[in-house]
């Protein structure tokens, strides 16, 4: 066994141990709850734009994009645009590495790799910040409800011709909305890639932390994921590529980062 393989095996053993340590996972969930009380995830930027993510989830995004090498990422929920910039920067890094390996000169604006962001309200100052960013050429934005038919038709038009698609769902966190998003967007996910449902951790929050929101315990992204799993197992669904649509929860990435907003939210298409 090579040294690289030995280290990879060592890491997998670490992750398995974490997954079996319910006390450690429980403490991490308490930490996340306390961090939310301090608006911790709102304190970070990515290449100059606010990114509303805990840093460990940013690591997860990096690992997933590097492993899956998507040519299109679809994101619902834009906010300040930091997540779009994060994704665009990772796609640009894939372009760079491809050019280095091929020994060719890179034209940054010639790549087909793109990220499409959807939000019901792209505020003017956020749109201006996104459009002024050097990575704006890799980003397309659509304003409107992510589950509106006319909006989803635009997303599908963007997705035409792409065969390695990744999906991030991070807009309205009610059960009804997230389930509708899953029914529309999850089938666009390419086999071997991911549909990540953010903020499933709402299910673990005390009621007072969601009192000013239309979502909360029993009505959130995790309950939507559970319902979608029942639909997949029951009636069976078809992916956009015409094949049977099946997902599995990737607990390995979750146990690797431990601190995450998305317990049971990393869905890998199989």
Over which residues does each language-model region extend?
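Short, compositionally biased "basic patch" segments
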Residues: 23-37, 121-126
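N-terminal auxiliary segments of SAM/dcSAM-dependent transferases
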Residues: 1-28
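Residues that form generic nucleotide/phosphate-binding pockets
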Residues: 10, 14, 30, 34, ...
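Poly-acidic low-complexity segments
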Residues: 4, 21, 54, 145-148
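Short, mixed-charge, low-aromatic patches
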Residues: 12-22, 41-47, 138-140, 179-186
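Class I SAM-dependent methyltransferase Rossmann-like catalytic core
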Residues: 29, 33-68
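S-adenosylmethionine/decaboxylated-SAM
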Residues: 49, 58-270
């Amino acid at each position: 066994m090579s040294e690289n393989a030995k280290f990879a095996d060592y890491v997998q053993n670490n992750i398995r141990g974490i997954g079996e340590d319910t006390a450690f996972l429980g403490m991490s969930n308490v930490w996340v709850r306390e961090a939310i009380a301090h608006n911790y995830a709102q304190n970070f930027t990515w290449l100059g734009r606010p990114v509303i993510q805990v840093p460990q989830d940013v690591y997860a995004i990096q690992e997933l994009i590097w492993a899956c090498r998507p040519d299109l990422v679809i994101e619902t929920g834009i906010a300040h645009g930091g997540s779009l910039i994060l994704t665009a920067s990772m796609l640009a890094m894939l372009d760079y590495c491809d050019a280095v390996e091929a020994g060719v000169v890179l034209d940054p604006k010639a790549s087909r790799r793109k990220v499409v962001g959807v939000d019901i309200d792209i505020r003017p100052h956020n749109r201006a910040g996104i459009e002024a960013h050097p990575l704006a050429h890799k980003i397309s934005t659509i304003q409107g409800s992510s589950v509106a038919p006319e909006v989803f038709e635009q997303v599908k038009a963007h997705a035409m011709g792409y065969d390695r698609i990744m999906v991030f769902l991070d807009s309205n966190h009610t059960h009804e909305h997230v389930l509708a998003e899953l029914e529309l967007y999850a089938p666009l996910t390419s086999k071997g890639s991911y549909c990540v449902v953010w903020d499933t951790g709402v299910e673990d929050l005390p009621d007072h932390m969601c009192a000013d929101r239309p979502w909360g315990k029993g009505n959130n992204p995790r309950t939507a994921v559970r319902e979608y799993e029942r639909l997949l197992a029951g009636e069976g669904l078809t992916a956009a590529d015409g094949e049977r649509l099946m997902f599995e929860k990737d607990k390995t990435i979750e146990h690797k980062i431990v601190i995450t907003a998305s317990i049971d939210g990393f869905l890998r298409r199989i």
